[in-house]
């Protein structure tokens, strides 16, 4: 066998082997078409369909940084330096349609950090303010809502003014476990009934931080509202099962123009003490009022004043300025006069304080 024959035989063997391997080769399947995310506009901006479902999802929230100086207008004490705090709030909302109505969920997870004027981590003034908390988590089917949310005593009539220090004179506890049902008519009328567990994170006159029910009897809240293009009027009544007392609020909002609106709220408590779940103002009664003026597309001026039966007066004003869409800077100044029965609970009768808030919402 000569060299030429050997080379020809080797080449033939290689060709045959290559043909056999080609016959046995695995053919990769064609890639499946990608199903792009679909926009869902049934529940507002920012929702999209979860792929493969008819459920709409929205991820939103905000990042906030606050700097406070001057006096603490809630306690009257002198800060003697800057208090700083930061928060990242992550919110997830879902919505879908069912044979029983719209099914929604809402959750909010808050990551908080604070440092007081001495630079001590975890402190904001005299309070511990760092940590992570599941602030809200509820399910809603039609008008039925169950889970952790804010009390209907607050939300049904509407929050106080668009100021940061809005609750120097408190209008009641906020977060609570609850089962509520809201009826909404087509003529502007609505009504609510709620069974609530009681607040768990609000301090009262004596420093109490837990207003949970202590048995099987829940707190009960009921309210009525009428709303139109001119504004709204609402009333709410709450029964505190722990102290077996009740509190009530009535509020009116009026839209003077498209840019200018005013509101007024009055409240009464049968217990006449702020150390309770609902009527947390001083004495029998309290009154709040405020206004909002949208000066330009970017700047809004807000003013709020309040006074209670025990003699506390609180006034706050701010300007919320949107530098760019989603980023707002709010400088605010507040004044509190501790008169009457409040004078014995604070170090100073008069308190002036300021805060600047930087917030990016998305």
Curated annotation (Swiss-Prot):
One of its GO terms (molecular function) is porin activity. Keywords: Cell outer membrane, Ion transport, Membrane, Porin, Signal, Transmembrane, Transmembrane beta strand, Transport. It is found in: Cell outer membrane. Its main location: membrane. One of its GO terms (cellular component) is cell outer membrane. Pfam families: Porin_2. InterPro entries: Porin_alphabac. It is a multi-pass membrane protein. The keyword Signal applies. Residues 1-22 form the signal peptide. One of its GO terms (biological process) is monoatomic ion transport. Consists of 16-stranded beta-barrel sheets, with large surface-exposed loops, that form a transmembrane pore at the center of each barrel. The pore is partially ocluded by a peptide loop that folds into the pore lumen. Homotrimer. The pore formed by Omp2a is larger than the one formed by Omp2b. Omp2b pores have optimal permeability to allow growth and protection against harmful compounds. The larger pore formed by Omp2a may be advantageous for intracellular growth, when the bacterium is competing with the host cell for nutrients whose concentration is particularly low within the phagosome. Forms passive diffusion pores that allow small molecular weight hydrophilic materials across the outer membrane. Belongs to the alphaproteobacteria porin family. This is Porin Omp2b. It comes from Brucella canis (strain ATCC 23365 / NCTC 10854 / RM-666).
